[in-house]
């Protein structure tokens, strides 16, 4: 139900009404509305009840198991929210002078340092405000590096077929031609295909390790040596860093640039479009091209902003100010609460949960896409057999899971696995929760055999039933408009 459907003529909330003297005559006539805005006429209680009711229908990490593959939907500690909301942080304006921002700048400086050490990079920039923007930043620096060397013929970016969809999109946005590298039958990058693709046109390769298949590529050092020998650079998509946090450093694998998703690995709230944070780290080659502003130590031990005047080869700023401050603070508090040993435990339990759940799913009769490999932090189940024999699809399983109180895993991604579920149980989930998920999947598998139509019509218990996805894609009518009788 839309809030407009509760609207009644003349119903208003006047507690916050402006004074009668609030004038509009200071505005030029051409900027004044000719007609009142089409807003719902509702009371304050109507508004509260409407949005409270909607919030109770949400699936979220605070209410449900949320095994959305490659999204790391882990618990967000409330201590991080509380401390990041201290008045000194909330009341600081982005334009506050450096001398009055030393506490905030100290937090950012320490976060830069911690993230650089955790990943084996020389330094970090916290400016990117999302994972995709972090990707763009990293690839833009690769382009700037080659252009600064006069290597303008390096116009090709290598991207595995198991990559996130943002990887080829980012490479294209930065002006590169994308060349896809296949995955071999065991889930690693096909080295023969890689070597054939390398040449003087190669700018670099974009990799996630562990990959979106949940598999750690055993040949990463060979890949790094081959790409570097060809004159290219290695970009690390940090989407799956949760699996190796504190255990393995991308810099030690040979990566030249990395982006992190603080809103995933470092446990800040995400979903619904934001907010995010995608810091980038670099080795020595790309250091001059890092975006600004960054935080540096000034003489006397204080902190200051580095600007384009300090970094003449920078690719420039990415936004009006400096990143999503609230997300950065929450991530800083998170790493300080955990410490190095705590971050190692994140990787331990992330991998443990993924491998336990994968084994339970296999024992329950589900087909793992790569049964010969150990899961990094997530794994892929293929329902190709069920689709062929029973006529039920990954979508049907996902919709039915909602009825049973579980958010669905990622479906139909990665694209190279047919009818797949990409399942990531973060480290904060208990064994009991994982067992309950397996029981739900077993129930759905039984229903698929006995009553497949039950799955095809799911969900049955939610306010919104099965949507017409074709119509929704073709008729993008998202704005409410009053009907004639209204």
From Swiss-Prot:
Keyword Translocase annotated: no
Keyword set, alphabetical order: Oxidoreductase, Pyridoxal phosphate
Names of the cofactor(s): pyridoxal 5'-phosphate
A single GO cellular-component term on record: cytosol
Catalytic function, reaction form: N(6)-[(R)-lipoyl]-L-lysyl-[glycine-cleavage complex H protein] + glycine + H(+) = N(6)-[(R)-S(8)-aminomethyldihydrolipoyl]-L-lysyl-[glycine-cleavage complex H protein] + CO2
Record has Oxidoreductase as a keyword: yes
GO BP annotations listed: glycine decarboxylation via glycine cleavage system
Similarity comment text for this entry: Belongs to the GcvP family. C-terminal subunit subfamily.
Role noted for this protein: The glycine cleavage system catalyzes the degradation of glycine. The P protein binds the alpha-amino group of glycine through its pyridoxal phosphate cofactor; CO(2) is released and the remaining methylamine moiety is then transferred to the lipoamide cofactor of the H protein.
UniProt name for this protein: Probable glycine dehydrogenase (decarboxylating) subunit 2
